[in-house]
């Protein structure tokens, strides 16, 4: 969806499609007695909390307000996001790139960001703590809101990321 949003010239219809898709996910979850869970950003960092949508003829401040019973989640590189709705769970994405430490400090201080995701080079060598926070396994699913708060969510480098030297992967 993020690629479509960035490249579309017809944002209004894109948002209509997004609302329709969210309604379908919510209806399917209700029919199966499960919790609807939607990740909006795949490779982008769109500030969905600032984008109004229309559902059933009513304008809402954002998609989260339009669907209060849906749990949304995303990863973000923006450490100072504020006014995050309760049904939008954000995980800060760590980077070891030089100069990024200030963003990590901001993210740790920001209560809107529940945890920090870190990609480690080797699953077998994951530390029990990282940057002063306990480490939990995040590779078994992408359901981040179940990881808890004030933790490091450990993800493991796969494919080309195993050889990454940019600072994205923490070599352990």
Give the label of every model feature segment.
Residues 1-172:
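Class I S-adenosyl-L-methionine
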């Amino acid at each position: 969806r993020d690629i479509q949003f960035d490249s579309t010239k017809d944002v209004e219809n894109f948002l209509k499609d997004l609302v329709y898709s969210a309604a379908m996910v919510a209806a399917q979850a209700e029919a199966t007695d499960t919790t609807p869970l939607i990740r909006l950003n795949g490779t982008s960092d769109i500030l969905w909390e600032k984008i109004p949508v229309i559902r059933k003829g009513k304008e809402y401040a954002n998609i989260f307000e339009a669907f209060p019973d849906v749990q949304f989640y995303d990863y973000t590189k923006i450490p100072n996001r504020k006014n995050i709705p309760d049904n939008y769970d954000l995980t800060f994405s760590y980077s070891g790139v030089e100069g990024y430490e200030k963003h990590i400090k901001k993210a740790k201080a920001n209560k809107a960001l529940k945890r920090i995701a870190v990609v480690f080079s080797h699953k077998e060598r994951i530390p029990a703590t990282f940057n002063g926070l306990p480490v939990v396994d995040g590779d078994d699913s992408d359901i981040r809101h179940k990881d808890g708060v004030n933790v490091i969510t450990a993800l493991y480098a796969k494919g080309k990321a195993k050889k990454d030297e940019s600072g994205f992967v923490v070599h352990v």
